[in-house]
Amino acid sequence: SALDQSQRMLNALEPGTQVPVHRHMETAETTICIEGYLEVVLYAEVSGQDETGGERKFVEVFRVTLCPREGKYGVQIPLGVWHSVDVKEPSTIFEAKDGAYVSASR
């Protein structure tokens, strides 16, 4: 509902899934792995644009394994932290964020 002030969703991910490096400036993100195996990768931005005015550049600073079989269930990604995922096997995750959904195109 548009009145709901939280975002909750299940997300099915396959190996090879491409999740662009991104961040959320209005909310932290909680990710819980229900099944499968993936790594959540945190980045630091090393340049706002490359020398041709192209894409931002990042360096990996931390990697968290999520795999329920190993007792590694979830991670809290702080507000504003650049992140992505590296899917190692078919996985299902639960994601939760604060606040109503706002399209990235806005």
Please give the residue ranges for each predicted region.
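A short glycine-rich, His/Asp/Glu-containing loop-to-beta-strand
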Residues: S1-V21, T27
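Short, surface-exposed charged micro-motifs
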Residues: L10, T30, S84
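Short beta-strand His + acidic residue motifs that chelate non-heme Fe in jelly-roll/DSBH
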Residues: P20-H22, V40-V41, V75-I77, H83-K88, ...
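Glycine- and acidic-residue-biased ligand/ion/polar-headgroup-sensing regions
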Residues: E26-G48
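Double-stranded beta-helix
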Residues: S47-R69, W82-R106
